[in-house]
Amino acid sequence: MNEINRQNYPSILQSFGIVGMVFISMACFIPLNYFLNHQVGKEISMLVYYILSTGVPAFIIYFIRKKKVGEVHIILNIGNRRVLVLALVGTIALLLGIISPIVTSIPMPESFKKVFLELGKMNGFLSILLAVLAAPILEEFIFRGIVLDGLLKRYSPMKSILVSSLLFGLVHLNPWQFITGFTMGVFIGYVYLNTRSLLLAMLMHSTNNLIGTVQMQFTDMESILNKTLIEIYGGLINLIIAIVGSVLVFAVCMYYLKIEFKKLEPLVQNSPIDIPLTDQN
C-alpha cells in the first residue's frame, strides 16, 4: 500500500512544483501577450495568454500523471441536483457575506488599485468567457482534478484539501485573491472530496467568478476601492445583516450537504480514488 501511494502523483513537494511550472509558463508567454495586446487588443490577447499560459502546463501535468499512474479518472457528471443547488448557494453565501468583507477590509496600495481598475475595464464578451468558462475549467482541472485528486491518494483529506487550497490561492499572486482562492478552494475541495465531481467544482468556481464579473460590470469599481467596508455595505447595520445572513445560509447549506453526502458514501467509496486513513510518505 505504501509503495502504491508513493507512485501516486503528485506529492506535496510535486504539487509545489506544479505551481512553479504554472508560474514559469506565465512568464514565458508574457512576450506573446505584449505582442498581441498591440495587435488585436487587450481582451483577445488576455484570453489567448491565459489559455496558453495555464493550458500548456495543464496538459504537461496531465501527461506526467498519466505516465506515473497509468490512468486519470475525471468525473464530469453531477448526479445529485440537490448537491448542485446547495453547493452553488453555499458558494454565493460564502463569497458575498464572508470572504468579501474580509478581503474588502484589507488596505490596497494604489498600484494594485490601478491593476484591478484596468481589469474592470475589460468587460466585453471575451473577458466574461475567460472568467466564467476558461478559468474554471483549466484551474479546476489542475488544482482539483490533478493536485487534490493525487494528494487524496497519499495524505489525509484535511491535509490534501488545505495544501491544494493554499496552492490555488498562491497562484493568484496577490493577498486579496489569495484569501478568496484559499477559502473558496477549501469549500470546493470539501465538495469534491464527497462527490468526486470535477464538473461540480468547475460550476462552483464559475459561480464565484461570475459574481465578481457582475460586480465589475454594474458597480463603480473606483468608488468601491476608495470606500471603507461599512460604506460599501451602506452602514454598519447592513453589514451585520449581510454577514449574519450569509453565515446562516452557508451553515444551512453545509448541514444539508452533509446529509446528501452520506447518501453518496457508497458511490464515493467505490470511486477510483482510494483515500488513506493516515498520511503516507
Describe the residue ranges of each PLM region.
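Short, Lys/Arg-rich, polar N-terminal cytosolic tail immediately upstream
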Residues: 1-9
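C-terminal membrane module of polytopic membrane proteins
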Residues: 208-281
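Membrane-interface helix/loop boundary segments of multi-pass membrane proteins
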Residues: 138-163, 190-197
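Functionally important transmembrane alpha-helices
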Residues: 27-30, 177-233
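Hydrophobic alpha-helical transmembrane segments
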Residues: 12-20, 47-48, 84-87, 125, ...
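Juxtamembrane helix-loop-helix connectors linking adjacent transmembrane helices
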Residues: 44, 70-135, 149, 153, ...
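Residue-level signature of the transmembrane alpha-helical core
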Residues: 51, 128-133, 137, 162-166, ...
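Alpha-helical transmembrane segments in multi-pass membrane proteins
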Residues: 18-66
